[in-house]
């Protein structure tokens, strides 16, 4: 009973990156800039997809939800991390810790299923272009998006339930910049073997599902059997950004959680954690936008309209006086 009470009132200390004053300032500026660019890029892309009627297609609906989840991932971690750079009180309660991990896990798992939906969309567009509108209807698109969020919620609920069964003791210092499961397992007074097994099974199965090997095989096979070089190039450019995003995201998560012995490696997983929680959400809007002619053309038109409106205002202001 004492152990249970102890675990319920537990507080942790997030040690973060470093206590060196000069390095702390540099890191704060770097991570604040990353967070700012991430939020502007992701929310800007969501707004563009929402406003522009031409982007109301399955691919962009999935993309809009993907970058929205990237914003959620970044917002779950970065504000607390930035606060801890200069705050003397680096404590975080057990429930705050669980909430932080829940929203991170929700965002990452939903991302996995959204990437899988985008893989299917890419497969239909390349392999069955004539049946695209039949196979990728709006109803199916909404169902797949809703399914991604439902599945995304299920995974963190299971993980948090198993985490709350653990009893934490010792220094309560989490040698990390956020509440991740692996550092929490290291602080457990009891053997977290069951938790590790559940994490390995869930993380492994989600990644295998997400990669959608069969879809990629058919996509690549169809592309390389195309007779037209122009058609092959167009097909590759359509799915290249998705291939890049999936490979970076899935490889980092598999390396982080699905490899044996990950719990016993101490703070060696921090660089990988920085990459998939902060860098990938920063890169995604640029990966999908800069390689997409449709998005670039729409952005150019919006910029031209803004310039035109600004010129009209300048011309009308002398007339008004």
From Swiss-Prot:
**Organism ancestry:** Eukaryota, Metazoa, Chordata, Craniata, Vertebrata
Q: Where in the cell is it found?
A: Cell membrane
Q: Which residues lie on this side of the membrane: Cytoplasmic?
A: 47-56, 119-143, 218-235, 291-321
Q: Name the species this protein comes from.
A: Homo sapiens
In the UniProt record, does the keyword Translocase occur? no
Q: Which family does it belong to?
A: Belongs to the G-protein coupled receptor 1 family.
Q: Which GO terms describe its molecular function?
A: G protein-coupled receptor activity; odorant binding; olfactory receptor activity
Give the domain of life: Eukaryota
Q: Note whether Transmembrane occurs among the keywords.
A: yes
Q: Membrane-spanning residues where?
A: 26-46, 57-77, 98-118, 144-164, 197-217, 236-256, 270-290
UniProt-recorded name of the protein: Olfactory receptor 5K3
Cellular component GO terms, alphabetical: plasma membrane
């Amino acid at each position: 009973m004492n152990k249970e009470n102890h675990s319920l009132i537990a507080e942790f200390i997030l040690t973060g990156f470093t206590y060196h004053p000069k390095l702390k300032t540099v890191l704060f500026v770097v991570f604040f800039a990353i967070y700012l660019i991430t939020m502007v890029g992701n929310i800007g892309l969501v707004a563009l997809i929402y406003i522009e009627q031409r982007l109301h297609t399955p691919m962009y609906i999935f993309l809009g939800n993907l970058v929205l989840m990237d914003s959620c991932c970044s917002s779950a971690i970065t504000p607390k991390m930035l606060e801890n750079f200069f705050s003397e009180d680096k404590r975080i309660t057990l429930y705050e810790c669980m909430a932080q991990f829940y929203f991170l896990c929700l965002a990452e798992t939903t991302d996995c299923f959204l990437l899988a939906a985008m893989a299917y969309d890419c497969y239909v567009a390349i392999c069955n272009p004539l049946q695209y509108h039949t196979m990728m209807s709006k109803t199916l698109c909404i169902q797949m998006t809703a399914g991604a969020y439902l599945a995304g919620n299920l995974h963190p609920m299971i993980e948090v339930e198993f985490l709350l069964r653990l009893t934490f003791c010792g220094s309560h210092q989490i040698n990390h910049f956020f509440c991740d499961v692996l550092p929490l397992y290291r602080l457990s007074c009891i053997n977290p073997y069951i938790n590790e097994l559940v994490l390995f099974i869930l993380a492994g199965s989600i990644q295998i599902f997400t990669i959608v090997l069969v879809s990629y095989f058919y996509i690549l096979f169809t592309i390389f059997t195309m007779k037209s070089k122009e058609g092959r190039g167009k097909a590759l450019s359509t799915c290249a950004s998705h291939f890049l995003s999936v490979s970076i995201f899935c490889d980092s998560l598999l390396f982080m959680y699905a490899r044996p012995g990950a719990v016993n490696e101490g703070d060696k997983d921090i660089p990988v954690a920085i990459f998939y929680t902060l860098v990938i959400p920063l890169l995604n809007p640029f990966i999908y936008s800069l390689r997409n002619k449709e998005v670039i053309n729409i952005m150019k038109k919006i910029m031209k309209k803004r310039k035109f409106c600004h010129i009209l205002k300048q011309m009308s202001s002398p007339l008004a006086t």
